Amino acid sequence: MIQFIQHTGIVLPLDISDIDTDTIIPKQFLKATTRSNFGLYLFFNWRFLENTPKILNPNFVLNDPYYKHASILLTQRNFGCGSSREHAVWALMDYGFKVIIAPSFADIFHKNSFNNRLLLITLSELKINDLFKEIATQKKGISFTVNLHEQIIYVHNKKKCFFEINDFHKRCMLNNIDNISLTLQYDVAIKKYENNQPSYLK
């Protein structure tokens, strides 16, 4: 796992609601169990022309050269809905995304993202649309800076908006705490509890 404090990156504007996990990564690419190379198949059915899987769709925003190295995804409500597949998070992260900003996320996708340290930021639809307008008025390839410690998104080095985040999630990401290291913090208490159990439970 990687500690997350602040990230500056190019923002990919994907102004679409209800993007499901099968759109993020189609089911035919879920056979592998390692986390590498899933970025090749991210938004596969949108990135490539139908029936020509090796020809990029020039009308899809991710294929625009300005967004080739995008690492922040700005999108609309209910991102990550549909079936539960951790591969969707792996695909986004393997491609290079560190942050996703949207009005809402599917619950299971949200949990999978936290477990993999993909930062999800929830903002009101009003603020989201304001950010889309900000991008539309600028040259392509605009960058945001996301400061997790301050919980602030900066645009052109100016404070743009404050975001809320679960205190526990924030602490884990700032301090690089995963499920294993979190459990180890309570090692003494766990051993004490186990030692106090009746013999037939040990």
UniProtKB/Swiss-Prot annotation:
What does the record give under GO molecular function?
Answer: 3-isopropylmalate dehydratase activity
Q: In what pathway does it function?
A: Amino-acid biosynthesis; L-leucine biosynthesis; L-leucine from 3-methyl-2-oxobutanoate: step 2/4
An example Gene Ontology CC term for this record: 3-isopropylmalate dehydratase complex
Q: Which residues form a coiled coil?
A: none
Q: Which SUPFAM superfamilies match?
A: LeuD/IlvD-like
Keyword Metal-binding belongs to the record: no
What is catalysed by this protein? (2R,3S)-3-isopropylmalate = (2S)-2-isopropylmalate
* Pfam families xrefs: Aconitase_C
**How does it associate, per the subunit comment?**
Heterodimer of LeuC and LeuD.
Functionally, this protein is described as follows: Catalyzes the isomerization between 2-isopropylmalate and 3-isopropylmalate, via the formation of 2-isopropylmaleate.
The family line of this record is: Belongs to the LeuD family. LeuD type 1 subfamily.
Protein known as: 3-isopropylmalate dehydratase small subunit
Species per Swiss-Prot/TrEMBL record: Blochmanniella pennsylvanica (strain BPEN)
